[in-house]
Structure formats: C-alpha cells, structure tokens
Amino acid sequence: MGSNKCTLDFYDYRTGLYSRNFYAERNPNVIKELGDVGNDIGIYGSKLYVVVNCSHKVEVMDAKTGIRLGQIDIPNCRYVRFYRGRAYVSSYVGPVLIDPDAPKGAVFEVDTTSFAITRKVSVGYQPEEMEIVDDYMYVANSGGYRVPDYDNTVSVIQMIDFKQVQQIPVGINLHRVKKDRYNKLWVTSRGDYQTRPSRLYVLDKRKGYNQMIVTDTIPVACSNMAIKGDSLFYYATEWNNYTSSNTISYGIIDVRSKEIISKSFITDGTEKDITIPYGIAVHPETGDIFVTDAKNYVSSGTLYCFTKDGRKKWSVRTGDIPAHIVFLPN
C-alpha cells in the first residue's frame, strides 16, 4: 500500500507465453500505471475491469488488447460484479484506516457503456464480495475497520429498486461469497484472528420462501474458493494473533452433500513449495487449478498451475502479491 505497485499480467494459453506488467506495456503514457493495490478483476462483454482499492478507482480497458478505455472513481473500492449491462462495485466509502466510527459502506451501480455512476445503495460496514441470485444481490459485510466490533451480516439488495431489503446474520468479519450451480451461497468468515476461527457458511432458500437463510456451517477455515461443477476448491491462510503464525490448508467440498471430500486438491506434494496461497481459480474448460503465492508480500510472487487431478503442470514468476485471476473467453 502506498507504492503504486499494482500490475496486470497476461498468460496466453495458445503459446504458453507469460507477460508481466502487461498494462504498462500497452499503456506507456499512463502516469503511475494501474495504481495502488489491485483488489479485484472482472470481464464483462469486451471490457476488462480492474478494481484499484487504494487509488479509489476502477480501471477499464479492452479485454483483448489491454488498451485503457477510462476509469471510474469510487472511494475505497473493493470488488466488482456484473448484471444486465451494469457493473456493481462494493466500497468501504471512508478512508483507508482502522476507525471504530467508520461509516457504512455502499454498492455503486455503473453504466458499462458510459462508465457513469447511476445508483448507489448503503449496506453494512466495510462490504466485500457480492453475488446475484434471482434479481437479488447478496453482499458480505466485514466491519474490518471497526475491530473488534466486526459486522456479521450479508446485505440483501433488491436489484429492481436498488434498495437494501434485509440483513442476514451470518458470522463475523465476512469476506468471500460465491454461488454454486444450485444457487446456494457459500460465505466465508475470517473470524477475529484470536479465539473465533474462520468458518465457511452455506445460505439457501427455505422451501416455499424467497429468503436466504444460513443452513449449514462447514467447520473449516477458508480464505478463498473457486467452484466448478459440484466441487468447491478452497485454501486457508489462517492468521493467529496469539501465535503470530499462519495455519495453511487446502481442500475440496462437494457442494451438493456439503461434505469435505478431500483435505487437499494438490496431490503430488508440491503444496510445500507454496509459501502464502493468495488467490485461486479453476479454468472453466480444462479444469486446471490455479493458485497464486504471495511469498513475503514485498517481492515477486508465483503462479502455479495444477491439473484437475492436482498434479503440478507449471509455475511462473509474477508481479508482487498475485491475487486475482480472470479468464478471457475465446
């Protein structure tokens, strides 16, 4: 943070070539390049969106060429999702600092043609990831700036009116939210890094009702996850303030049975080469599993590619703290 070291890399599946700092190469006249702290990435239509948290903006570029098209100014922006011609960006709203009086966060609606902000709705404290199911958006609120008074809710936004209609109590310090192909939501809690551990929660609709409720608590730590078919691949880098150390784990959960079916998706022992897992994605066609390694947080990281059976295929040096992956459709 504070060093404008956000970069964009590009891997070409056809040639096997990996290009570091792709954005700077394609946009040599952009001052300070991408900016400070890249926090999310997404593709919608022909455009690529990069959420740059501490530069308070979303950079927009052509998804195939990487040429810059413009930017959207949003304070302390976090994550981006897309729906019916609009981009939705979660925002902490307030400045980047721990503050027990930090304001509630918001979700901004952006026109993907003009890049104009069209609507805004207030949600919980320090909102993170979002998902949309049946014309409702679900937003994980962390309250991370208000430690130890974390938020514990998922905000529900009705997309037609763009109003918050409910807050679902789930767990403290929420972060990730992903939907599976059965429209269940998988939500992570980071816990309090002391006595309350990270957990994974399942939200589903009650029979005959249109409201989501917490149906299951999966007793695993989960920092991030990727879902393909009926398999949820996850890793955990669980920090403990008492021991000043991380506990790292990997696994696979069957989203239908909600059972842990494997304690690691890496099967050849090469997980020992990963220092700090920091991002995960599964290729939608090949099933290849990608894991990023942040290493020491200050120098180049590594991107690992594993087969769908968990065997290492290759690895490559990346920019600093690699974290977010998106696949460009053919």
Question: Whereabouts are the PLM-identified features?
Answer:
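Predominantly soluble domains enriched in secretory-pathway, periplasmic, or organellar proteins
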Residues: 1-330
